[in-house]
Structures are given as structure tokens and as C-alpha cells.
């Protein structure tokens, strides 16, 4: 079960615990699968308008790949802080990217003083915050007047086969989960996303679309790629019996069938990239 907004049976604290545990479980594999998201990193950094000397916060940074990619853009004199709730993700980042700073933090309660960053980034993370309005308010609080945020989120489910094929397979073959979950596509409407930014007090909201191309030789390759990105879902799946996991791995071929191209599968997924500014005092 997924929800498009918090419902009475949704437990935000438990959701965070599940996501944290799931991402801790896949930290090393998530970093290794970074090539799948390289074009998204470039597009988000381009939209952010980084420059030398800026101080940058990367929220939901995971293994620090986006944060590390930002560092050359703010050099010389710049500083990048990678922040995440999952400590294993941060440990992976520290081991691979010693030149950036790290802070374990909940994006809905950031441990930073007001107005201390020139830019705040959040790549494919905002939809995992149970209270996205609170997370955006925290981004606005810690960014300087005249500063900017740049976030990316998955578009609507039909436009994201990289994720939706696996989720559809799970809905078809597994019983409904006992714990309500937020949909990773819940911020996939451009107008809604821009409206959220405006409602939080940001100015000049702008939303554009970026396409992500991915290819897989076999359903098994696709399924493993999904597991390497899936966070809380990966944690839940890891507790299933081996025969059920094998059924999912083979069964996803049904959902992938529309994307068969030659001897493999080619998927085009869409991501929304949104930017907005914190207005300077008049």
C-alpha cells in the first residue's frame, strides 16, 4: 500500500526507521550503482547554479556521490556538507569522499543555524520525507537570503518504469504490506511541486523534466538494479523467503515486456528538477 499523503494509519516515525534500515543495508551497493543516476546529478547541479566559494548542503546525500560532484564546482574556497539519516550511507561517503564534510541529520530537523548555506541540494530524496512541507521549510531556514535550493523527485508512476515495473510486480505477486508507505511518486506533478515551494515561502519556483535512460540485458539484471536503489523496500524484501524472491525476480519480466528492445530492455524514466530561491529582504 502506498499513500499520496499522510493518512491516519501512517506512522512517520516508523517509516523513517524502515527507510534508514533499508538504506543502511544497501549502502555499498547503492554507491556502486551510481552510474544509473549520473545524468541526473549533472542536471541537478547545473540547475543549482553553483559557483566558487559557495557553501553547499546536500540532503539525503546517501553515499555522497552528488556532494562529491558538487565540490569541484564550488572550488576554490567552497565547502560541501553531505547529510543523511542512514549512518552506513555516511560511512560509505566518508570512506570514498574525505574532502567533503558529513553530518548525520533528519531533514525535517536540521542541526544547522539559520542562513548558513548558499545552496541546498536534495537529489531524489524529498519524497522520502514524511512531511515534505516541513523538510522544505528547513531547507529555506538554512539557506541564505538570495540563496537557492535544487531538488529532484520522480515524476508520475507511468513515467518512471525504472521503479514502477518492480513496484507493479510486487503489487501483483505479494499481499498488501501491513505498514502503510508513502508513494515515491507523490510529488511527481510539476504544478503541485511548484505550489509546495511557493507555499513554503520560496520565490521563483521553476520545474523542468530530465530523462534518465537505462538498459538491462535480462529481468534479473533489472531486478538487482532495483534492489540496489530501493531503500526501505530492499529491507522488507530481504526478509522474504528465497523462493518468493526468485518468483519476483523472474516475474518482473511481465512488467518489463513493453520495454523489450532487441536482446534487452530499454527504459526511459522521467525526473522533475525543481529550483526556488529565498528572497532577499527588501
Predicted segments with their positions:
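Conserved class I S-adenosyl-L-methionine
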Residues: 2-54, 65-69, 89-92, 96, 148-175, ...
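Conserved Class I S-adenosyl-L-methionine
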Residues: 8-12, 17-19, 36-37, 63-65, ...
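Class I SAM-dependent methyltransferase SAM/SAH-binding core
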Residues: 55-110, 119, 134
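A short SAM/SAH-binding and catalytic strip from SAM-dependent methyltransferases
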Residues: 118-132, 155
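A short glycine-rich, Lys/Arg-flanked "PGG" loop and its adjoining helix->strand segment in the class I
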Residues: 133-148
Amino acid at each position: 500500500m502506498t499513500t499520496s499523503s499522510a493518512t491516519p494509519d501512517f506512522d512517520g516515525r516508523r517509516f523513517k526507521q524502515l527507510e534508514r534500515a533499508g538504506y543502511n543495508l544497501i549502502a555499498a551497493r547503492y554507491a556502486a550503482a551510481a552510474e544509473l543516476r549520473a545524468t541526473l546529478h549533472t542536471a541537478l547541479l547545473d540547475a543549482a547554479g553553483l559557483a566558487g566559494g559557495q557553501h553547499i548542503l546536500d540532503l539525503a546525500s546517501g553515499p555522497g556521490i552528488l556532494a562529491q560532484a558538487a565540490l569541484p564546482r564550488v572550488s576554490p574556497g567552497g565547502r560541501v556538507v553531505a547529510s543523511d539519516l542512514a549512518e552506513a550511507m555516511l560511512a560509505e561517503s566518508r570512506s570514498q569522499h574525505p574532502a567533503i564534510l558529513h553530518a548525520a541529520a533528519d531533514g525535517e530537523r536540521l542541526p544547522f543555524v539559520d542562513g548558513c548555506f548558499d545552496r541546498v541540494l536534495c537529489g531524489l530524496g524529498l519524497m522520502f520525507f514524511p512531511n515534505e512541507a516541513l523538510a522544505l521549510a528547513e531547507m529555506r531556514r538554512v539557506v541564505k537570503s538570495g540563496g537557492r535550493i535544487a531538488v529532484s523527485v520522480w515524476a508520475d508512476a507511468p513515467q518512471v518504469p525504472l521503479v514502477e515495473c518492480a513496484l507493479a510486480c510486487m503489487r501483483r505477486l505479494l499481499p498488501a504490506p501491513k505498514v502503510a508507505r508513502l508513494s515515491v511518486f507523490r510529488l511527481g506533478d510539476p504544478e503541485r511541486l511548484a505550489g509546495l515551494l511557493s507555499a513554503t515561502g520560496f520565490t521563483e519556483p521553476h520545474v523542468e523534466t530530465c530523462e534518465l535512460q537505462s538498459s538491462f540485458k535480462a529481468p534479473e539484471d533489472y531486478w538487482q538494479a532495483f534492489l540496489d536503489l530501493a531503500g526501505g523496500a530492499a529491507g522488507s524484501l530481504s526478509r522474504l523467503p528465497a523462493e518468493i524472491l526468485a518468483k519476483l525476480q523472474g516475474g518482473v519480466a511481465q512488467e518489463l515486456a513493453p520495454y523489450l528492445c532487441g536482446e534487452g530492455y530499454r527504459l526511459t524514466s522521467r525526473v522533475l528538477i525543481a529550483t526556488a530561491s529565498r528572497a532577499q529582504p527588501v
